[in-house]
Amino acid sequence: MTGDTKHLPLEDIHVAAGARFGAFAGWSMPLTYPAGVMKEHLHAREHAGLFDISHMKLFKVSGPQAAALLNRACPLDAGALETAQSKLTFFLNEEAGIMDDLIVTRLGDTSFMVVANAGNAVADEKHLRTLASAFDVVVEPLERVFLAIQGPEAWAVLGRAGIETGSLLFMHGIEPRKDWFMSRSGYTGEDGFEIGLPEADARALVAKL
């Protein structure tokens, strides 16, 4: 894979683990490891699994009209969200067609985190910035490693790594440390957490896990 293919910040860790890579949404992504897909699947279902989802995009939306912007962009009453509450929603076009599904989390009175999919990240940012021009807001794309720790033992695994998760409810998200975003969410059907954090912190966390 050459040309404009994007690479994960932690690609070297995947290479060292024996990953086989394939193309997905313009990214070179680890698809399989020597243990095999079935063992990985069962381990995540029965214990916990670590997934690198850094191809997904985080946007921080802040300012006096942050909620109003998200109300305009999504079928969502952003102002009704409680602090730390997350909501699955969509970006809609002018014909009310779905552009992308995403999760919006309220971080504070005037700030929100938006997690969008890799395949639509560029279009999502363009759409959000176009709408934002009519509002008193700042749209900030974040350069973060994004990790998902999923499975019934995810909370215990993170606890052993020094990350407290017990007070974080499902479909809620917080900023537990400087430049970190952590939510209790995922797409595996099990309990789990998603953490966006700087590369240096991510490498330290992966080493502990």
Short names for language-model regions:
Residues M1-L209:
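Basic, glycine/lysine-rich polyanion-binding surfaces/domains
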